[in-house]
């Protein structure tokens, strides 16, 4: 079974990071991807889905952070690759670059692992991500923090050279994603700086993957879905000769229009979550504007 023919919403790997990928988004939105038609029967087990995506130097999994089923799938992906001896490393958006478990033994305690990764439980509940991390540690595989350290974010905001890391089309797509991702509530003057942070984070994750690469094995990156699209995310910063596979996890009964083959290699659906107004939550958490 290939990634193109598997009945679990896989789409044939397409043009990767090239500019034409951006141009295809409009067409994908209108026509969709025929391989994304929900199957009549249950999808194959996770090990079979993973096998359909191999070989790969890097396997990027874009999740919805508040979907427990996504973290369960991620753990199963780690276990499947580890069981085959094909897991090189696990990289995480949820920990900062420079933190890793390389000095820990497979029998390390969860407390030791959390300390080694500088884990921030307030931002990333260990209850959700601990099983994913420990599956790698217990398999004797290193876990790397991949996110841009918070201390470097301020400098990234003013680093205009980051704009040139993406093509004009991809940069605009990233700016639009930042704008809508913040519920159109950001002043336009903040779109550029916030986009640079996103680019810097994607580049940091890509650098971590490259450093963890091991011939014949796969490095897995677990991140939010916003970091994984081929057209503007982490894949944009990876060498073109590397075999990169991207999986989008979607908590929905049907994939979105932007989940076509130019963006992801496979889309795995999980049960929809209860309705939630994320923009209302975001706006409620923002400080009130000062009175004029």
Segments predicted by a language model, with ranges:
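Bacterial N-terminal signal peptides that target proteins for export
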Residues: 4-22
